[in-house]
Amino acid sequence: CLKRLQPGEMSLQLLLSGCRLRLEQETGVLGRFADLTRKIIQPDSDETVRFSDGIFIRGLIPQRCNTRFSRLAILNCYYTYKGSLTTPICSENVTWLIVKPRLPATNNMMRKFRRLETPAGKNPPLMCDNFRPVQPLNGRTVFEVHRI
């Protein structure tokens, strides 16, 4: 049975995914994605990054998770917890999924990501240092998912 919610009853829940990076000399798909950021540096850009540009989600999944059983979703390799946004307003309505294995990244790739810009009116306009210090758990539980 579905219930129609009234505006005062609605609540916005967010599901965000994140990853941890490991600095390396060379990378594959994530490096190609970083190269494509030149098309979308400004948020109001009319450019589009398409599948034909060679970016496939399964290529971002670390090899030890990239099996035929979990190729499109890292079902066996993540942490999850109830948390908050990392930038103001820091709302606490977020479920985080963090990829367990670290993804490879290079210094050059990180420089490309740091050129990305935020929407107009932000100062500074660059999308870097958009994090906050690690927060206390405050009674939250972090779950490590081994298998679904």
UniProtKB/Swiss-Prot annotation:
Entry GO CC: extracellular region
Subcellular location: Secreted
Ranges where the Alpha-carbonic anhydrase domain occurs: 1-146
InterPro entries found in the cross-reference section: CA_dom (IPR001148), CA_dom_sf (IPR036398), Carbonic_anhydrase_a-class (IPR023561)
GO molecular function, one term: zinc ion binding
Tissue expression profile of the protein: Component of the acid-insoluble organic matrix of the aragonitic skeleton (at protein level).
Keywords: Lyase, Metal-binding, Secreted, Zinc
The UniProt record lists the keyword Metal-binding: yes
Main localisation: secreted
Necessary cofactors: Zn(2+)
Enzyme class of the recorded protein, top EC level: lyase
EC number: 4.2.1.1
UniProt catalytic activity: hydrogencarbonate + H(+) = CO2 + H2O
Pfam short name (any one): Carb_anhydrase
Similarity section: Belongs to the alpha-carbonic anhydrase family.
Physiological role: Reversible hydration of carbon dioxide.
Name this protein carries in UniProt: Putative carbonic anhydrase
Species of the source: Acropora millepora
